[in-house]
């Protein structure tokens, strides 16, 4: 019953950080990258099997709690810093010590900001195409195809790959 109460709460801090020291909360999206899977976007969820918070991928695999601090990065920080080229300005994201008052760090969620990310991708790359098929979003950027169940997640996946691999 304790786990049910935890899940109903508001973005519960889970007691660990990502590999850059950012506190992780229930429902946060994180980035994991390795040589085998490449770049993956996972969500912090309570796993009833292991009875702990894990980073769960849409395909069903997860990163266990004890590995979160060494294997994950908060998605919002990766998108803002690496893809949008912004920095922390007090409680806001901004540029050149100028905070963007519509981008408070605490509330910025890149999965919900897919319009901003898709528009930015569209300005940088001429070859941008999206389609939904069998409940899955497919996004093509510069001849590279990305797919996920949520449009916001596939947009973030493409943005991170483009930023890190200079697609």
Name what the model sees in each region.
Residues 1-167:
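Secondary-structure transition motif
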């Amino acid at each position: 019953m304790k786990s049910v109460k935890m899940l109903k709460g508001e973005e519960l801090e889970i007691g660990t950080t990502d590999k850059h020291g950012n506190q992780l909360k229930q429902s946060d999206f994180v980035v994991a990258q390795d040589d085998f899977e490449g770049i993956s976007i996972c969500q912090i969820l309570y796993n009833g099997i292991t009875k702990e918070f894990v980073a769960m991928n849409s395909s069903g695999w997860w990163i266990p709690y004890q590995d979160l601090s060494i294997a994950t990065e908060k998605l919002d920080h990766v998108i803002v810093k690496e893809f949008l080229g912004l920095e922390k300005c007090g409680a806001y994201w901004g540029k050149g010590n100028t905070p963007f008052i519509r981008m408070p760090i605490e509330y910025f969620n890149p999965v919900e900001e897919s319009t901003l990310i898709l528009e930015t991708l569209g300005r940088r790359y001429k070859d941008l195409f999206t389609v939904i098929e069998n409940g899955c979003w497919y996004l093509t950027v510069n001849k590279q195809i990305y797919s996920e169940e949520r449009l916001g997640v596939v947009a973030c996946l493409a943005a991170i790959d483009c930023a890190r691999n200079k697609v």
